């Protein structure tokens, strides 16, 4: 069962899982997913969620900010990372609905060439620099390109350090 797999991952010292509804055939706020999220929280597993549009199903979004807000209303104690700064082409909605959520982080995966430096700065400041994690989504984005995007923002050196490594250290308990 999925619960046995989660327990095995936790026993092995894994830090989390990634879920991608487009490829795993679920919507983030489906009732059948709630016990899975809860068990991840109990086991201390971080849940990374693909969010927003995916090229495999561009007209059928499986995770967005509204769905994640409904999930957060039903579960507590689960650490979520909502990928792609809140969702591919859904970042502004995520900023409105998820900024300030206690157990939610955002990552920079697949942002290079898609989000301007000004918009990235605005999103980081809305979420809080302590809630953003460096990620590339390689091979879709080269880590160097994401790094160049972050470097081209008006974020402070301290905010950039948080994004590049301090936040991950804190989230992962390193």
Where in this protein do the model-derived segments appear?
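Histidine/acidic-residue-rich catalytic or RNA/ligand-binding cores of hydrolases
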Residues: 59-67, 90-99, 116-125, 140-152
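Active-site gating/metal-coordination segments in enzymes
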Residues: 1-55, 59, 114
């Amino acid at each position: 069962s999925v619960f046995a797999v989660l327990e095995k991952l936790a026993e092995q010292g894994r830090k989390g899982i990634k879920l991608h509804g487009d490829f795993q055939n679920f919507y983030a706020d489906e009732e059948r997913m709630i016990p899975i999220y809860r068990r991840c929280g109990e086991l201390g597993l971080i849940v990374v969620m693909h969010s927003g549009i995916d090229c495999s199903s561009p007209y059928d979004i499986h995770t967005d900010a509204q769905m994640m807000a409904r999930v957060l209303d039903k579960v507590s104690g689960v650490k979520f990372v909502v990928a792609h700064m809140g969702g591919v082409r859904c970042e502004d909605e995520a900023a409105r609905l998820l900024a300030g959520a206690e157990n939610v982080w955002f990552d920079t995966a697949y942002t290079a060439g898609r989000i301007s430096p000004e918009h990235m700065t605005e999103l980081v400041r809305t979420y809080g620099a302590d809630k953003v994690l460096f990620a590339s989504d390689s091979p879709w984005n080269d880590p160097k390109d994401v790094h160049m995007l972050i470097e081209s923002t008006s974020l402070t050196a301290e905010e950039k350090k948080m994004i590049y490594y301090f936040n991950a250290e804190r989230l992962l308990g390193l």
